[in-house]
Every structure is written in structure tokens, then in C-alpha cells.
Amino acid sequence: MVIFSSYFSKQMNRFSTPFVFFFKKLNNTLKKSLQFIMRFHSYHPMFICLLRDSSRNENRKKKVSIGLRTIMRAFSFLMQVATCLIRYSLILTCLVAILLSVLWRIQFAALRMHDLIEEELKMFVLQHNCTLADLWSGKCPSSEDE
């Protein structure tokens, strides 16, 4: 879990987004919760399982929780899934930001083009002394006729 936590920290340091602070806080919270679980396990008699302690007498057995190991495996798996989701959500956020930037530039260019066309139409109508309805119906003389 410590390896995963340091890997998670290194990955988060690679991104310079506003979300980094939040994810660092999340990482610290997860570390503290893991430490709490380990302390709870060492003092709580509810988790009982027998594992051999190879450093001591072979007949002595150490109480360790199968339930805790299962919880820790599930927790580790969920953390890996969360890391993938965070990584891909950051990548997706960057892609969406790029897409929105491109769309905003296209929209800005289209609005400028619309304004230019509108100005040209107004000037054409004023020069030829006709209305927009005349222009659309074809009654207004074109600049090629002159």
C-alpha cells in the first residue's frame, strides 16, 4: 500500500492542474485511514486467524485477520481503480478543455465573420438605395450590373 501511495503521489505531481491539491489531500486522508485500520487491527480481538510466526517458535501462532487481509485487498483494488479513474478523468478534462478552446475560437471567428457580412450587406443596401427584402428577392441591382 505504501508503494501504491508513493506511486500515486508521483503521478499526481506530474499534473499541474487545480485538482492536484484536492487529490493530494485525498491521498493523505487515505494514508491516515490505512494507518487507523492497521492500529485498529492490532488492538482489536475481533479479527482472529492463525498464521505461523516463522521468527519465533513454530508452535506459537500469531492472531491475524483473514477479514482484514480481505478488506485490505479490496481496499488496494479500489485504490487502483480510483487511480485509473483519476488519471483518465484528468486526461479527459484536458481533452475537453482543449476541445472547448478550439470551439470557442471557431465560434469567435464565426461571430466576427457574421459581423463583417452584416456590415457589408448594410453598406451594399445603403449604396444601392434598396431594402434587404429587395436584395433577397433579386430586385436590388448587383454590383456587377453597374
From Swiss-Prot:
The keyword Transmembrane applies. The chain crosses the membrane at residues 85-104. Keywords: Cytoplasm, Meiosis, Membrane, Transmembrane, Transmembrane helix. It is found in: Cytoplasm; Membrane. Its main location: cytoplasm. GO terms for biological process: meiotic cell cycle. GO terms for cellular component: cytoplasm; membrane. It is a single-pass membrane protein. Has a role in meiosis. This is Meiotically up-regulated gene 96 protein.
